[in-house]
Amino acid sequence: AEGREDPELLVTVRGGRLRGLRLKAPGGPVSAFLGIPFEEPPVGPRRFLPPEPKRPWAGVLDATAFQSVCYQYVDTLYPGFEGTEMWNPNRELSEDCLYLNVWTPYPRPTSPTPVLVWIYGGGFYSGASSLDVYYGRFLVQAEGTVLVAMNYRVGAFGFTCLPGSREAPGNVGLLDQRLALQWVQENVAAFGGDPASVTLFGESAGAASVGLHLLSPPSRGLFHRAVLQSGAPNGPWATVGVGEARRRATLLARLVVCPPGGAGGNDTELVACLRTRPAQDLVDHEWRVLPQESIFRFSFVPVVDGDFLSDTPEALINAGDFQGLQVLVGVVKDEGTYFLVYGAPGFSKDNESFISRAQFLAGVRVGVPQASDLAAEAVVLHYTDWLHPEDPARLRDALSDVVGDHNVVCPVAQLAGRLAAQGARVYAYVFEHRASTLSWPLWMGVPHGYEIEFIFGLPLEPSLNYTEEERIFAQRLMRYWANFARTGDPNEPRDAKAPQWPPYTAGAQQYVSLNLRPLEVRRGLRAQACAFWNRFLPKLLSATDTLDEAERQWKAEFHRWSSYMVHWKNQFDHYSKQDRCSDL
């Protein structure tokens, strides 16, 4: 059918020509351009290295099918169970995985249209833009936006870091994301998208990624608004320091017998050896580098390297100027439950998970792995219902709150308050609807990750058997998200009768509940619990110094050192641009 090619499905980008495909959606067709390469494959000697833009290709590239998923750990906790399998890779694994997908209305928009860019979660060790739950056709058809989603390197491939080395500088998974954002700036206009109106959105580690781009100046100019769903860059799991990053990288090397001979070689030899190891070997040993038995902790994550991140996320948030930024943030009703079945004693999806007091105490140590004895005591004190200190259902729910508050709700609340206080316009939500189709048990409530299917409009697909109310609810949510992408405000511009979603401020702390009922405005995102995590616990720790003296000094030193290094780097860059450097 060469002569009858649909011109709507042929697009020319900087790298060359693309052929997409037309897809049916409820309400009309959309165009999809799947598996567009944006980066040279990071294979062989390029493993662990920062990305290089894709070189141009000849002819018309076929962009009609998803490409490989980045090499990653595959979850085998409950084989064949829908609740875990939906997050597992749905394409073959490969290190040659740096492709992105673009969904656009059919026919293409004639005037520049706001762009939504999705960053998937998965603890920085897993995830893919091709998962069914991120299917772009419903949102694009319903709201007429352009949607882009990239793959990025995860696990050891994306986040192995030997600080100071060129061979494994760390954070290359975030640099993959940044390169995709640069690709959007250069190419999205060809799809009808507006490069001057780009909204990043992501969930969990994807939301943490969105936040890290907010805090990294070279990324900041590549987008205009941000949505953080159930994750934040200041979460205790989202970054590590350079010392811990090096410890994990060298331990991984030891586990895969690098360098052979066992003598501690230099970084260059170590990385050269790691590059010879099959991808699966690295994945197989990935989890063994964590410092403690823990849940909601991941081995290879972004590192505070003084480059992508000039300081800790918390310090950057506190120091930042966020004038003119619009942000939408939120959490689900039961952030902690999903993680408990992955290692908290006494928990399973196949029973009520009633736990004993002893299991609760042990669970706190796994759920707050870095806590001193005293800090763990404080957590137990705060979360015990002292009228019913042995009640198994209450203890189960309390441990879920510990894990959810510590890792998601309170970091998100802290971020929202700081951004609002420093000039951003912030909208906040709690997502409270448990899908009628959910396969996880009732005690898990509305688990981490289960708002996504509604934001992407899956209930519009009749074969998925959602209810009519859920279909209407999904349409409402897509409208909020798309309004936010268009204007920076989720409210309907034309409909003053609809209940209004007010901005979140540090003082009033207003947020909305998202469920099948109309919007309801509430105040305080778990304000009491978050005062414990965000105000009291840090004081307790600095007073008792489980941050032993050495670490406290190290932290103070690091602040001095990082500002000195930034100064030195500027001086050196200035010097190296002078003539005398080139003819040595």
Swiss-Prot record:
How is the protein disposed in the membrane? Answer: Peripheral membrane protein
Gene Ontology CC annotations of this record: extracellular space; plasma membrane; synapse
Q: What class of enzyme is it?
A: hydrolase
Q: What is its EC number?
A: 3.1.1.7
GO BP annotation list: acetylcholine catabolic process; choline metabolic process
According to the record, which residues are glycosylated?
266, 351, 465
Q: Which UniProt keywords apply?
A: Cell membrane, Disulfide bond, Glycoprotein, Hydrolase, Membrane, Neurotransmitter degradation, Secreted, Serine esterase, Signal, Synapse
Oligomeric form and interacting partners: Homotetramer; composed of disulfide-linked homodimers. Interacts with PRIMA1. The interaction with PRIMA1 is required to anchor it to the basal lamina of cells and organize into tetramers.
As for family, the record states: Belongs to the type-B carboxylesterase/lipase family.
What is the protein named? Acetylcholinesterase
